[in-house]
Amino acid sequence: MSNGPLRVGIGGPVGAGKTTLTEQIARALAPRLSMAVITNDIYTREDAEALMRAQVLPSERIRGVETGGCPHTAIREDASINLAAIAELNAAFPDLDLVLIESGGDNLAATFSPELADLTIYVIDTAAGQDIPRKRGPGLARSDLLVVNKTDLAPHVGVDAALLEADARASRAGRPVVMAALRHGKGVAEVVDFLIEQGGLQPCPAHSHGQ
């Protein structure tokens, strides 16, 4: 890509499955294109360390930024800390095709600055309750892709999965929704296909981009 890598923002509340989604995308695409990940944590680099332990990417392709008290500021009002991390990764890996930017745990109102992300994915958690899609925050309503995660838990938490999906789709004005159980791999292929199609990615047949 002549204009630099595709930048994909991944947002959603704490515990919804952002790091799991990041890991699964890396597992699917890292062997097929040059990619890197930036995680935003409030005071630690816990998410970056979790991705390193999962060994889905070499550690030098993972950057953890510490955002301080307001994680949404680092993805929206003042994205400089993330833009600097992207610039570092671009310098280190000039062939970079894709950068995933995982936001710190945020609420339904947090969104990514267009300056930072070309595409945005928002993750919500079935276990958070039946009414989550009706709360209609901008991340949920206006992200390019909504992932409703942990659908396998619906029967255990008293959630009607079909109604949850209907409400999620109703809140999206035609934008795509993926019903997923990311830990079990359900929904991952749809997310990857979305990134390839909407992001103009051209993954090679599987090979290693280790360095």
From Swiss-Prot:
An annotated Gene Ontology molecular function: nickel cation binding
Gene Ontology cellular-component terms listed: cytoplasm
Binding site for GTP: G12, P13, V14, G15, A16, G17, K18, T19
HAMAP family, per database record: UreG
InterPro entries: CobW/HypB/UreG_nucleotide-bd (IPR003495), P-loop_NTPase (IPR027417), UreG (IPR004400)
Function, in words: Facilitates the functional incorporation of the urease nickel metallocenter. This process requires GTP hydrolysis, probably effectuated by UreG.
Cellular location(s): Cytoplasm
Protein name: Urease accessory protein UreG
Subunit architecture: Homodimer. UreD, UreF and UreG form a complex that acts as a GTP-hydrolysis-dependent molecular chaperone, activating the urease apoprotein by helping to assemble the nickel containing metallocenter of UreC. The UreE protein probably delivers the nickel.
Domain of life: Bacteria
Alphabetical list of CDD domains matching this protein: UreG
Single biological process term from Gene Ontology: urea catabolic process
SUPFAM superfamilies named among the record's database cross-references: P-loop containing nucleoside triphosphate hydrolases
Source organism (scientific name): Paracoccus denitrificans (strain Pd 1222)
